[in-house]
């Protein structure tokens, strides 16, 4: 049974990808008002931003119970982040592991900036809950995706703004198979299909071929993770019920 907490509105970090789309659905099931926030930081896979409106429209029209809950969308130009980043997410370079053990797809400070800006918007909009798709289970070791980072950031933002916001990360302890299953629990096969076809994950921005698991090059780390998770989800591997 999905829990519903309609007392507060939520602002969801929504890139146009699988994880953040699942988080939008998760928030729509819980809150009366859900707004979305995207960032254009010069990402190599900017096509994800072009998917956002299609996902939002599909959520409105295919899921009547959520239609009135989905509120405004916000898009922030954060090109300064791309300008100061020398990564495979913002440059056309090979994806590889760096000397510090992190992949060069790591954009230093990205989630910290995202959440800080989100908090400022939520403060102005009267929204108490911030929702992000950060995950510490199936991830690339990004330090700004860790649970400890999010908890520390929640404390810092509340101190700095003298407020009581909550940072929700519903995917934090889920693997990709469980993320697919969570989508099924939230919106059935219709939501799984929406996410499969309408969202974008591929780091290199490839959207020419629709695979069983969605669009993508099939070779970058993001595609491999999405593919592996989808196949495990179909087989029912590693998961009995995704925690809600």
From Swiss-Prot:
Q: What is its EC number?
A: 6.3.4.20
GO MF term (any one): ligase activity, forming carbon-nitrogen bonds
What keywords were assigned to this record? ATP-binding, Ligase, Metal-binding, Nucleotide-binding, Queuosine biosynthesis, Zinc
Q: Which cofactor does it need?
A: Zn(2+)
Keyword Nucleotide-binding on entry: yes
InterPro entries per record? QueC, Rossmann-like_a/b/a_fold
A Pfam family recorded for this sequence: QueC
Q: Which NCBIfam families match?
A: 7-cyano-7-deazaguanine synthase QueC
Q: Which protein, by its recorded name, is this?
A: 7-cyano-7-deazaguanine synthase
Q: Which organism is it from?
A: Burkholderia cenocepacia (strain ATCC BAA-245 / DSM 16553 / LMG 16656 / NCTC 13227 / J2315 / CF5610) (Burkholderia cepacia (strain J2315))
| Designated gene of the protein | queC
